[in-house]
């Protein structure tokens, strides 16, 4: 999105974090399972911004303080970004189990052209659906559009 304010992309992150938290809360109301969803961002920069702006009380699945609360989308062959070196949702425990198996996720993207999660995510989940599309406004100007998809029943990659 184009704005007159060159700092526009730096604005609106608290609103974006609150938006993701609201979706987590609303989806939680439909499920008795506390912290059912983990959060995946479409790229590591978005994941970093959401990790900082997502309220601490947001009910997301967070297995340990070592894990990020918002994960960057993982590609097993891509280790080029900072989130690749943090505990990952696609990693296995020493016993071969996954902390994220069968969990549901919210996939968050700021790519307004994206109509569905990327193929690597669609293949890892039983199904996906678009939950919401929301423009983020700062000082009366749009700074980004956020799309949030629900992704159901994560299946970690086979060993």
Predicted feature locations:
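Luminal/periplasmic acceptor-recognition loop/helix of membrane-associated glycosyltransferases
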Residues: 2-159
């Amino acid at each position: 999105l184009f704005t007159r304010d060159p700092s526009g992309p730096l604005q609106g992150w608290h609103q974006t974090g609150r938006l993701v938290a609201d979706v987590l809360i609303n989806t939680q109301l439909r499920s008795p399972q506390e912290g059912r969803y983990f959060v995946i961002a479409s790229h590591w920069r978005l994941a970093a911004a959401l990790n900082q702006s997502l309220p601490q009380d947001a009910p997301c699945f967070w297995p340990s303080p070592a894990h990020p609360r918002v994960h960057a989308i993982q590609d097993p062959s891509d280790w080029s970004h900072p989130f690749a070196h943090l505990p990952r949702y696609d990693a296995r425990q020493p016993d071969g189990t996954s902390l994220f198996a069968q969990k549901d996720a919210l996939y968050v993207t700021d790519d307004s052209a994206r109509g569905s999660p990327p193929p690597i995510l669609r293949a890892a989940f039983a199904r996906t659906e678009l939950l919401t599309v929301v423009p983020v406004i700062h000082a009366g100007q749009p700074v980004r559009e956020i799309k949030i998809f629900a992704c159901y029943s994560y299946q970690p990659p086979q060993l």
